[in-house]
Amino acid sequence: MTKSISVLIPCYNSKCKGLVATLQRQLNKEYETDNIFRYEIIVADDGSDRNDVIEYNRQINMLPHCRYVIRGKNVGRAAIRNFLTKEAAYDNLLFLDCDITVANDLFIRNYITAESNVVVGGLEIGGDSTLLCNNIRYLYEKASEKAHNACNRAKAEHKEFRTTNFMISRQLAKQFPFNENIKWYGYEDVMMGKELAAENVHIEHIDNPVILDDYEDNATFMAKTEEAMHTLKEFEDELKEYSTLLHYYDIFRKYHLTPILYAIYITFGNVIKNNLTGNKPKLILFNIYKLLYFGTL
């Protein structure tokens, strides 16, 4: 059983004091059970520009063994996680996104009793389906939720590595830092999964999910999606065989059909995007749009 843990949460314009308080209560219970157990929670603010968020999160510093570190400049998802690794005091690092909820009272216990050096807990899709029926992020995540239970994730352990909710030994985190060359949004976790695979590092997948119940609006999510396509284009060679979209794009390229993708995007791209950012998005168009958009890069 793990005797010490650093919980590391990168944060940008998100109020996460409630999440930290929940985690601290669970960690303190472990300490009360075993006084040898040591823990800390570090929240690193990656250049937030909302003063109300910063002031609210300052309350984290009042919780035992918790600290809120304010970084004046936004350095990106990879660099802020590497910063947290350097700040951590203990040998096991639990990385969590800031916009999630922990509802399982045994969440921390499930991690500290895991035996592997890399453990991925997974994601549960929360929220009111009636209220979110026209949110494209919710529709996308909900449609793929069952495919990402621990059993299915374990079948492709490295390709299914995600940074939303995972624990890694500090030694491995330092040996395999996140790729800070990734400046756009997305794929830093896919890249790390590939690097772990190259060194035959086992990734254990368990059913210990956090809950995603905070969804950006459709326009914001589509902007992030387009940004992720730029990342995929920039690191296309490195991410081959780790992207379904690249697999299908290569089929078009093999048969010299990529100009067709470009032509379809020029003709229908705005129409499709207007649907996806609108009030009644059609999920079937989402992956089509990604492929078409990628074809223009």
Question: Model segments located where?
Answer:
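Acidic donor-binding segment of Leloir-type glycosyltransferases
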Residues: 23-70
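Glycine-rich, basic loop-to-helix element that forms the pyrophosphate-binding segment
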Residues: 71-88
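Short aromatic/hydrophobic "clamp" motif used to bind/position activated sugar donors
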Residues: 93
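Conserved donor NDP-sugar-binding/catalytic core segment of glycosyltransferases
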Residues: 105-135
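Acidic donor-binding loop at a coil-to-helix junction in glycosyltransferase catalytic cores
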Residues: 184-192
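Active-site donor/metal-binding and catalytic loop motifs
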Residues: 199-236
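Non-catalytic, C-terminal membrane-associated alpha-helical segments of glycosyltransferases
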Residues: 227, 246-297
